[in-house]
Design a protein with these regions (language model features):
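Alpha-helical transmembrane segments and adjacent TM-loop junctions that form the membrane-embedded core
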Residues: 1-110
Length: 110
């Protein structure tokens, strides 16, 4: 009985995605030929919905339209792997990534 209660409770509460799924998200994002890196991955599951947020590191010289298109392609690939997922992608020029302070809770996501 306790296991049923625990599973029901887990389903209602937000949970960070397991490490294996987070690693898969990183592989998917970094697989795009124009992505130079990614960081600040945040992921969670709330009920049946998966939420994915990350920063893509892109070439400084891309136009806004090019960067937007790359972001869309990564988003669509993630949504294909996680149907129904809410995906938010922030784009960073590669030159500013080293200068950004990293919050302690994200140190392992660089």
């Amino acid at each position: 009985a306790w296991e049923i209660v625990r599973q029901a409770f887990d389903h209602l509460m937000d949970r960070e995605l397991p490490d294996a799924e987070r690693a898969r998200i990183k592989r998917i994002a970094k697989a795009h030929k124009d992505v130079q890196g990614m960081h600040d991955l945040r992921s969670r599951r709330s009920g049946t919905t998966t939420f994915i947020q990350l920063h893509l590191e892109l070439d400084d010289d891309l136009t806004l339209l090019q960067a937007h298109n790359i972001s869309d392609e990564v988003e669509w690939t993630l949504q294909a792997s996680y149907p129904g997922a809410e995906v938010i992608i922030h784009i960073d020029p590669i030159s500013v990534v080293a200068d950004e302070p990293v919050p302690d809770f994200l140190l392992n996501d660089r």
